[in-house]
UniProtKB/Swiss-Prot annotation:
Annotated GO MF terms: ATP binding; serine-tRNA ligase activity
Cellular component terms per the entry's GO annotation: cytoplasm
Organism encoding this protein: Burkholderia ambifaria (strain MC40-6)
E.C. number(s) listed in UniProt: 6.1.1.11
Matches recorded under HAMAP family: Ser_tRNA_synth_type1
Keyword line: Aminoacyl-tRNA synthetase, ATP-binding, Cytoplasm, Ligase, Nucleotide-binding, Protein biosynthesis
Entry annotated with the keyword Hydrolase: no
BP terms from Gene Ontology: selenocysteine biosynthetic process; seryl-tRNA aminoacylation
Keyword Glycosyltransferase: no
Localisation per UniProt entry: Cytoplasm
Predominant location: cytoplasm
UniProt: ATP binding residues: R266, S267, E268, E353, I354, S355, S356
UniProt protein name: Serine--tRNA ligase
PANTHER family hit by this protein: SERINE--TRNA LIGASE (PTHR43697:SF1), SERYL-TRNA SYNTHETASE (PTHR43697)
Amino acid sequence: MLDIQLLRKDLDGVAKRLADRGYTLDVAAFSALEAERRAIQTRTEELQARRNSLSKQIGAMKGKGEDTSDVMAEVGGIGDEMKASEAKLGEIQTRLSDLMLGMPNIAHESVPVGKDEADNVEVRRWGTPREFDFAVKDHVDVGTPLGLDFETGAKLAGARFTMLRGSIARLHRALAQFMIDTHTLQHGYSETYTPYIVNPEILYGTGQLPKFADDMFRVEKGGGENTITQYLISTSEISLTNTVRDSIVEGSALPIKLTAHSPCFRSEAGSYGRDTRGMIRQHQFDKVEMVQVVAPDASYAALDEMVGHAEAILQKLGLPYRVITLCTGDMGFSAAKTFDLEVWLPAQNTYREISSCSNTEAFQARRMQARFRNAQGKPELVHTLNGSGLAVGRTLVAVLENYQNADGSVTVPEALRPYMGGMERIDAPAQVS
């Protein structure tokens, strides 16, 4: 959530910066609510002052034995008006809060202004795409004989679900374990196991609600007035970041660095017809997430560090990739700045997103009331960052395509062999005649 004081000081400036993100701030609606709020607060202060004055007057009158009934009646009327004003003020505050909850974060000044992904800026590349001396297959054609089972996944749960079998399932697990081990043993993150189902207020904290309710899978139990609504997490960023919700941590405890491997659930409501083949876009997928909670003056150094941690996974796996800076129109709702890592997929002859690393600055912290005690001993909002380290399913896709062989087998990357019992190659199971 943005700082409402910023809007009160520079409403037109905020509106312009939000317009760079493709968001139209209803300046008239905000101004009208603010004017009404100020008027009610001013009137309430006047009523409070009048009531205090009358209370003193009543005390003096009683001391003289004078009749106070008229003054008492006026005090009662003031009390009634103040109650009505408080109710009206509460209504206005709710409407202001609803308006604020729908506003995206303001982009950092270093973010390129643009409309969509066409305006993103490439930062660097690593690795050279492999040259094949045979016809390259996509991950579906490579993986299906080896244990990718789209048919059974669809039979069990519908479109955009996949079953993994045998060595492919083991490779998928190996990738997640390798990522977690790298982040915990080499990058300083603390491994965390989180709930996969969370309460609605947790999603408000990280920014998925109220705007993206249609992208979430909702779980309801009970019935009628006793219905309890919860949501499946779309990323473990949600659970990890909210661990500092409604708390004040000591400055000496920062940075807090957490990582988790979890399934993620997304309805993909706005992606009809996109990436319908294979594992690129699924309703259920695994991801290893990185989260950092840091002091404000350290957050952009932490962002660069987090990008480096995601890059390290790709480099250890020998997968070519590029890093891009997302433009204002392509960033996620809560982000102030985002770097995407895109891995090379030879069958598509292009780079595809495999990690997104974002600094949300104080945007999530303000929604969560997550603070730290600064050097002066005063509570101050933390900055929160999140990044994929990496999306496990898409990494599996990249391994299958980049390490495929002419005979249909897949070479196991060296970094994964300790997690695969020393296996160097995945071959299709022998067919029984």
